[in-house]
Amino acid sequence: MAEILNGTTPTITYKFKHVEVSDIATAILTIKKGHNIAIEKTLSDAIVGEDTLSWRLTQAQTLSVLGSAEVMINWVTTGGIRGGSNKTMLLFTGNHIMEVI
């Protein structure tokens, strides 16, 4: 079993190229393990940057999805534009940065 040390839990970051982060009204990060939703975080849980949204996982969350998991984000802007992205990836203790077109 992998040991996760304090301060080494991953941050999942989405970088937006064509959407102003300040215009995002709703965002949901979902991490699925198999067919089950293991973690769900909202915009209020996010660290908001100029062109990024980031979510930091706790040690318990990281252990619950360690290995292959599907990471998804869905968002809606204040103008009603919707978008989403999903990717199956290996989640370890490093940081993960994904670009959203």
Predicted ranges, named:
Residues 1-101:
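Contiguous segments within soluble domain cores/interaction surfaces
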